[in-house]
Amino acid sequence: MAKGSIGVTTSNIFPVIKQFLYSDHEIFLREIVSNAVDATQKLKTLANAGEFKGKTDDLKVSVKLDTEAGTLTVSDNGIGMTAEEIDKYINQIAFSGAEDFLNKFKDNANAIIGHFGLGFYSAFMVSKKVEIHTLSYKEGAKAMKWTCDGSPEYDMEDCEKAERGTDIVMYIDDEEKEYLEKNRISALLNKYCRFMPVPVIFGKEQEWKDGKYVDTDTDKVINNIEPLWTRTPTELKDEDYIKFYHAIQPGQEDPLFWIHLNVDFPFTLTGILYFPKIKNNLDVRKDRIQLYCNQVFVTDSVEGVVPDFMMLLQGVIDSPDIPLNVSRSYLQADRNVKKISTYITKKVAARLEELSKKDTKAFEEKWNDIKIFIEYGMLSDEKFCEQAMKFALVSDTEGQFFKLDDYKKLIEGNQTDKDGNLVYLYATDKEAQYSYIKAANDKGYNVLMMDGQLDIPFVSMLEQKNEKSRFVRVDSDVIDNLIRKEDDKKSELSADEQAMASTLFKSQIPAIEKSEFYVSFAALAATDQPVVITQSEYMRRMKEMAQFQSGMNFYGELPNAYNLTLNTNHPVVKKVIEAANSSLEGELKPVNDELKATNSVIEAIKSLDKDGKGVPEDKKADLKTNEDKATELRAKKDELISKYAAGNDTVKQLIDIALLGNGLLKGEALSNFLKRSVSLL
């Protein structure tokens, strides 16, 4: 028997492993099984080189539990090891030193195991003792047994072993008894080893017999040694891809389409990415794409390997150029990983462009299911955006689809304003904004539908990329103001009449929570609506963008600001003003006369300010007295007009019709409108 100390530069590696890898200790099984698979693959390589003459068609890895002995054993029939190889690969562990080791990896637990060839030692995370029973493939080799109880000391001696290969026998620690449970081991094997390239056996197949499941004599192979991504795309059918999709994403609808990745230069990468029906569900989950290294599961947290927007997809990526054990920060900084990320982005964009050209109709039918993915990509990845500008679609209120360039050509002849700006009109709710859409259509304008979750930031992005272009929601102003074709029409209301109208209508707008209303005027055609409610494009968009950008919370807290726009050329509006003037003439005349006289006094006093330093001291009191008087007179005038308006059903009806058209008339105000409508019949 040989005794010795493990050649490490720290006095005891095992407390280090247990301390810093405790949170990830389940990966020991992946490491031990991966080593076993490597041993079988190396034997196959030797056979191909003519250095091994035996059979290689029965290579396998077995995992066995012995709850009575408290052991978990991983066995392979690979190359095995000689005493010298045990000494080299197990006993002599070299790395840079304890202090550097701890400082570098204490925050990156998963980066330790495997990074310095320590995969075997991960067994000590869950074991109080580990044995190696091994017999090398080399002719005349002796079977060896190596034993270590977690201290730097080990024993090595000859043993009896009939078959070539290695058994790793782990005596599970009392605190880690979960790794003696069949279901726990089965779950870990399914997670980490389900696609390993060599059969992995755990337990027996079962059959239903005498009212219960019983073991058969057939070994249960838990993995698929030739997963779909390792096969040539030309030999696969659609049903193969769909079947594999449901194997890795059970319970999901069939995918829309997929991309089979296959590249071997300047890096090696295979995989399959599936496009599910995303629709308006911006759920960026971190576990939909699984990352493998030579068919060994690494992680399903692929930030850094693929751009964020790609995490809306599902599937697998396999690359030996991504280290098996890495931290997230390592992934994000690795040069190969960055190249892989760029390649995947380019490949996905190319596939989408190909689909859009190959069958335009089919691509349009899928658009609403993938729209949010493409918009998210265009908003977050500039390179993807450049490619996507060629195939991204927009749709109008009639349900027609257009590529961005095609739509620009469609509208630039008719929707360019007098200043040369191309105006894109859009709606977010076809039913609620029907009257505004119709007003635009009546002018011969086309209106886009922008009702998706990311459409508002998408609109802002398109504005930035297209000079002399702007997007405006169709209800943000009257249509003639949205696309100005000529100078303003002449208003048929005087300034005094507009002032009267402003008070008449503003005084009767019902109070609506978190909303403010302003009265404005537009000289429209007599056949246009008499009263229209609009919402400023700028303020509304700022509030909407506040949902996406934390720095814009200020806008999100502001009340909704609406304009009650009166058509100064509409006969009903003019009739209301004429009736008010006629009815209030006797009451308003003395107030107006006194206000006019007071304003004259104010102007006379202000004219005494010759040098811009203010009125003379002896006139300041007179100025304030008259300004206060003017304020009182204006308030009295507004009170008279408001009192008149309160009894005028036409004013209220015009306001309520406009509110109703915007979905703003509710509760008591809606009930009053209905009663008034009946009484006016």
PLM features per residue range, with description:
Residues I112, V130-E153, D173-K177, N183-L681:
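GHKL/Bergerat-fold ATPase module in large chromosome/replication-associated machines
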